[in-house]
Amino acid sequence: MAKKFNYKLPSMVALTLVGSAVTAHQVQAAETTQDQTTNKNVLDSNKVKATTEQAKAEVKNPTQNISGTQVYQDPAIVQPKAANKTGNAQVNQKVDTTQVNGDTRATQSTTSNNAKPVTKSTNTTAPKTNNNVTSAGYSLVDDEDDNSENQINPELIKSAAKPAALETQYKAAAPKATPVAPKAKTEATPKVTTFSASAQPRSAAAAPKTSLPKYKPQVNSSINDYIRKNNLKAPKIEEDYTSYFPKYAYRNGVGRPEGIVVHDTANDRSTINGEISYMKNNYQNAFVHAFVDGDRIIETAPTDYLSWGVGAVGNPRFINVEIVHTHDYASFARSMNNYADYAATQLQYYGLKPDSAEYDGNGTVWTHYAVSKYLGGTDHADPHGYLRSHNYSYDQLYDLINEKYLIKMGKVAPWGTQSTTTPTTPSKPSTPSKPSTPSTGKLTVAANNGVAQIKPTNSGLYTTVYDKTGKATNEVQKTFAVSKTATLGNQKFYLVQDYNSGNKFGWVKEGDVVYNTAKSPVNVNQSYSIKPGTKLYTVPWGTSKQVAGSVSGSGNQTFKASKQQQIDKSIYLYGSVNGKSGWVSKAYLVDTAKPTPTPTPKPSTPTTNNKLTVSSLNGVAQINAKNNGLFTTVYDKTGKPTKEVQKTFAVTKEASLGGNKFYLVKDYNSPTLIGWVKQGDVIYNNAKSPVNVMQTYTVKPGTKLYSVPWGTYKQEAGAVSGTGNQTFKATKQQQIDKSIYLYGTVNGKSGWISKAYLAVPAAPKKAVAQPKTAVKAYAVTKPQTTQTVSKIAQVKPNNTGIRASVYEKTAKNGAKYADRTFYVTKERAHGNETYVLLNNTSHNIPLGWFNVKDLNVQNLGKEVKTTQKYTVNRSNNGLSMVPWGTKNQVILTGNNIAQGTFNATKQVSVGKDVYLYGTINNRTGWVNSKDLTAPTAVKPTTSAAKDYNYTYVIKNGNGYYYVTPNSDTAKYSLKAFNEQPFAVVKEQVINGQTWYYGKLSNGKLAWIKSTDLAKELIKYNQIGMTLNQVAQIQAGLQYKPQVQRVPGKWTDANFNDVKHAMDTKRLAQDPALKYQFLRLDQPQNISIDKINQFLKGKGVLENQGAAFNKAAQMYGINEVYLISHALLETGNGTSQLAKGADVVNNKVVTNSNTKYHNVFGIAAYDNDPLREGIKYAKQAGWDTVSKAIVGGAKFIGNSYVKAGQNTLYKMRWNPAHPGTHQYATDVDWANINAKIIKGYYDKIGEVGKYFDIPQYK
């Protein structure tokens, strides 16, 4: 039975006639786009918004720019003491199927729940007295309860922690006959590790014998036996997070999933990188937590937050993980092992036990099919079909997950060991003999909001709390933030991180630090007096190693505080004094009383009672989030609110007026003035003038570049890509306070980086002296700077390769550039060699540096516009992508263009040759002028302009539109109108060239050549699979495609039925069936008059052409699709819902003065469609039919057309991911609706303009 959501779907997802198709109505979550605009559980939303566009540029290389590799440490290598075992616990957990409101893709709910992170701990420790005395002479005692809310950072690199051991109850693969008791809530056991790119997985110590029992498989599985026999190991878990993915809490809060869902990608030809890249480009529709194949586990979203992978009901509950298809026995076995290991790790980490939900809808391990069956909100049935194709089953996979979990929990013997005894559960803990490995005991982890200083004598930093020894550290006697507390057995650890950046250092033992509780910082706006010489610190409770500066001047100075934090019982304030900023204990500050202002009459001119002084200044400042606004003049009484906060600006002037001090801030990179700000509203630093430098450094991947020195997160210009240290070429340097910032370029990205993140590369070895030659003399005299040039080059077949920088010692393979022509924009001498920078054929994108010895180079002249027709010679070199192009860059061969007419639009000189750019055979490119012959002059002929009504599509963005035909001066580029409709009203032929006069999409009238127009625009996209392959996938689905061989009787379609229905070549040749490829997200600018003629006699929709036209343009929807939707929903405009009514006292009133209309059936639920539909229309304010058309179109567009599947064919067959997210089961669904749309086009007197046709291999 179809499930309703927000809107009563027509039974064809807009078009299908009653009884003509079976439609899947519940397309949510992984199937539809979630409204993110009002969700209050989004974390770091400002930063996400600011970095989205920059992050998207990295999508095509999904796992290259990983700053670190996540390592799951297997705690199974640490054998637990028998005393730590508990009795068997039969704990049943019942999944709550109640729909929970929250912005988790549930389309019926608009309420957002503000879930907050929950700090959890299972151990209670007694208060500890701290007898350490600071240099300030007061004692810091840790005896105060801190009840402030802690913001927990859940994205620590994960390591399989070791929670309390509990027996796992294996559920048989059969429905339960007895009621299931409610499941006990278990405390999540956080993953205990730090960010560490160098962390390595532990190697299990050789343990030929163990006292643990061997696991007894619950199902027979040759693949699982193969995995066990070969003792397959799971790979390191890689993190490839994307900053612009939304972060929403689960329904129980951040870091509290209730289980894991098994998916498969349903794409037999894709790879793990391809799946991730596709997901990142289409994350608005769906994204998951991780992908697994036979070689890799890549986590793509933090598991502490929900993903959009399993529908509106399942998304706020479960972790979603996709299995990428593999094609041989060994690879499939490895992928199952990898999935089971990842799933067991997640269950262990979050304190969940394996519990299959497949047969009763209750548990922690689900398939997508089980979610569809028991919870709803989705209709997928994976991964059963894929598993069956490898003679495997979900039951076998679950058995492997269960075994992995028990191994990790130390309940059964690891693979590769021999079990000697089968221990019984003691009624009382006994004292075992000394184990061969250390006992771990119970692990508890809790969030912490404190600070700590590492003592000079310590045990080192630990990557995980399971490590036997720590690594030596120099980070002693400094104050760090503490974000986590962990207790393992009798040991207690703190996770310490840099106070200001959040960079994690590692775990330290409790006895190795001086610890203090800390409350969260709060913003303040208070002035104090401070004595000269008082130290400022970079952190509160800072040490001598963290001094930011000293207060200068004579006599008491003014310290303007902007932030305050309580450390134990002491108060520290952050602020500025004389251009320096830092933290000071409140004990060193004296509160200054605010002067009482004396009322004065309002002057007609700015007051001059107070002395004004203005001086030039060279500094930088960041405006605090809390401020008094921007002042146009320092005489203004109040400032204007500003959003330019927490950004770095240049300061050019300083002004004092009475007791107030102001800074004049401007954009750092342009002359744009922002305004005056009060001194107390900024964090200010002195700055020296920038100086030019020419220096090379190395920088680590992931390092941020900023658009300004001392930039903030709002001014990120990018991040360093690549693996291993990269070369940063600095060209400018500026000192901000005592820090040095350098501006330069790395891997094509430019920006500012603190010198602290740069390293000077080791000096290269001196080369053996060579005798002087003419080449060397040239190299010595050539300036060592980059020159801008205009040249063109062909890469030789045998070349030394391409470099990202001339400083790279080793070039990358340049074979793919060989025997091709590229533009040259830069030239630089380096040592004895000369290099040039090659750009792609569009001039825009630099490819890399080549040695000139590897190129044939010619000078390139300026492009000149021309308008001339030529005849192509019988013997010619063809049409090329680039002037002086090679055989590898030919668009049309010489035979294809010989004796043809070439319409040139511009020309350029290459050395002594001239190349012309133009059009021939509907293709554009370059031809050598030697291959062309200019036609003999003929007498101009001009026909009279005649009326001609037709809507074309502009197909040549490189063409022009004209004020008058054949005008050489009054012409303008068509680039902005490419692929847009052009409504023609007149036709004229001049000198054999047909011209059309009509209206552009912006309403402007113009002349365009017929060669730049097309009656329809057809695009083809390659699928990558054969028709047989995709048809086999569709025919093999658990829910088979349907066909009516006898009217009214549905049966399963066979392979031939499906293949016939999916054959795009056949469909594209049929004038009606072709319309299933019509793009429904592209309006055609059909005239309002034509629409009104078609709507004549269509009830309240009559004469609503203007409304449909407006709706189509506003929301990007094909007009005919929108009209057909409305006609079917309203019974050709005659339904009461369309004619309008009101709802008064929850009753429908049809004779009210004000009526509300609903022409698309939105929210017209089946139980009472008229009342519900009118209520929705009233809430939306649709008190006219035109408002209902325009307002309803927005919903139609967002719910269907804009969801990614923008043609009827894509809606039915989803060729990009066959067998998934399909809107119907009837094999004839797209055909039926294509005929309906074609019929409407015929009645309107138009044809479809935009088609998107898939092509199979």
UniProtKB/Swiss-Prot annotation:
Signal sequence residues: 1-29
Modification after translation: Undergoes proteolytic processing to generate the two extracellular lytic enzymes, probably at the septal region on the cell surface.
Function: Endohydrolysis of the di-N-acetylchitobiosyl unit in high-mannose glycopeptides and glycoproteins containing the -[(Man)5(GlcNAc)2]-Asn structure. One N-acetyl-D-glucosamine residue remains attached to the protein; the rest of the oligosaccharide is released intact. Cleaves the peptidoglycan connecting the daughter cells at the end of the cell division cycle, resulting in the separation of the two newly divided cells. Acts as an autolysin in penicillin-induced lysis.
Entry GO terms, CC: extracellular region
Any GO molecular function: amidase activity
Region annotation Disordered: where it falls in the sequence: 99-150, 173-217, 417-441
Record-linked Gene3D superfamilies: 1.10.530.10, 2.30.30.170, Peptidoglycan recognition protein-like
Protein name according to UniProt: Bifunctional autolysin
Family: In the N-terminal section; belongs to the N-acetylmuramoyl-L-alanine amidase 2 family.
Keywords recorded for this protein, A-Z: Cell wall biogenesis/degradation, Hydrolase, Multifunctional enzyme, Repeat, Secreted, Signal
Cited PROSITE patterns: GW
Listed Low complexity bias regions: 173-208, 419-440
EC number per UniProt: 3.5.1.28, 3.2.1.96
Annotated region (Endo-beta-N-acetylglucosaminidase), positions in chain: 777-1257
Coarse class of the protein's main subcellular location: secreted
Record text about domains: The GW domains are responsible for directing the proteins to the septal region.
Subunit (UniProt): Oligomer; forms a ring structure at the cell surface which is important for efficient partitioning of daughter cells after cell division.
SMART domains, A to Z: Ami_2, LYZ2
Positions of transmembrane segments: none
Residue ranges of every copy of the GW domain listed in the record: 444-518, 520-594, 613-687, 689-763, 785-860, 862-937, 944-1018
UniProt keyword Secreted present: yes
A Gene Ontology BP annotation from the UniProt entry: cell wall organization
